[in-house]
Amino acid sequence: SSWLWGVMITPDNDVVQTGIINWPSHLCSFTGNGYTSGVPDGYRKVNSALYDLIPETDIRKQWFLSPDNKSSLIDNEQIEGTSIVEYFGLTPYVNTKFGAYQSIFGNTTNASDWPLMRVEEMYLINAEAEAMGGNLSGGKSTLENFVRTYRDPSFTSKANSAQDFQ
């Protein structure tokens, strides 16, 4: 709903008909037909050091499994009575952000749309333009309002200069 630019994919598109030569087969941890499915520890992950830098209050922390294999995005999801983590053999730090087609875990249709640019990017560009244009406090305010609303309610910019802000 906030996309400015994207590629809308349907099951009959060539990119889907090829099977695994597409976005979901590379990045979706929950597809039944992809580079990540069935390959021991073949899932896309975040580095543990980077994961540890994400504040607990930031929704982006839930885009990856925690060290104890938890993510609010999939904690209650199951296939045939088995947890998603167990069913797919997921391990800590695995990406949970990109869902399966039609939110059906384990399906083999890789027809997920591809977001290329979202409206949110314009807010970030505006914040940076304010800061780089000599209004650091305005840029920080724009950024803080955006991040607090959409990502992390406790976020505060620590930038002391326009260069720090970048």
Regions found by a protein language model. Give the residues of each.
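Acidic/polar-rich alpha-helix caps and helix-coil junctions
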Residues: 1-21, 51-166
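His/Glu-based metal-binding/catalytic segments typifying zinc-dependent metallopeptidases
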Residues: 10-43
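Periplasmic/extracellular electron-transfer cofactor-ligation site
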Residues: 46-47
